[in-house]
């Protein structure tokens, strides 16, 4: 399964990073960071309308290289100027061609919150996200225990961050809710085989109480898709490949927000 492979290479990468910088040193780096002055992501999600999380992504396991020309800073700035509510940055290098320095540089250059899009399997990676400018992390229910979901979310909040707790099945939505998730992501992509079913998020939306913001992820391509998600009561959409392939990124974000 692709997800198992992703977790395996993440463990190898984590061990390498831990050898390069100890957790104690990383904590010191985080402790010295200035206070974050970007808009609060959770408060923004609770405001009316459908919010857009625009993703900076060069490649994926299912599509390979999405774009060869990858001016990541210019892309992120265009998202920011177009009114994106947050910017997701892939930092997974082996399958997504991501890197932590993309996150750090983008976080320094944009006015909106940034999300570290990665496979968080250890508290070290949460401190690492914070040290590189992220104010949002992703916690994937399928790769974490119930205790980890709770502990990692609480650690993120202690560091002044928010966690999107991502589910793909009804059972995972239940686990996300039981863990105390304050933001839930419903993925249309099955991370085990990377197949996409756009209706997945629509089927599971009703499981989440209205007081908890919900983000629809993956397979969102058209204005019609966006309208369906808005009508179903989603608070936000995360869009990656569709934006990365577009030559009119600003116009596309504006159109999605307007039609919603």
Swiss-Prot record:
The keyword Amino-acid biosynthesis applies. It is an enzyme of class 4 (lyase). One of its GO terms (molecular function) is indole-3-glycerol-phosphate synthase activity. It catalyses: 1-(2-carboxyphenylamino)-1-deoxy-D-ribulose 5-phosphate + H(+) = (1S,2R)-1-C-(indol-3-yl)glycerol 3-phosphate + CO2 + H2O. InterPro entries: Aldolase_TIM, Indole-3-glycerol_P_synth, Indole-3-glycerol_P_synth_dom, Indole-3-GlycerolPSynthase_CS, RibuloseP-bd_barrel. Signal peptide: none annotated. The keyword DNA repair does not apply. Keywords: Amino-acid biosynthesis, Aromatic amino acid biosynthesis, Decarboxylase, Lyase, Tryptophan biosynthesis. It comes from the Bacteria. Pathway: Amino-acid biosynthesis; L-tryptophan biosynthesis; L-tryptophan from chorismate: step 4/5. One of its GO terms (biological process) is L-tryptophan biosynthetic process. It holds the Pfam family IGPS. Its EC number is 4.1.1.48. NCBIfam families: PRK00278.2-4 (NF001377). PANTHER family: INDOLE-3-GLYCEROL-PHOSPHATE SYNTHASE, TRYPTOPHAN BIOSYNTHESIS PROTEIN. Belongs to the TrpC family. This is Indole-3-glycerol phosphate synthase.
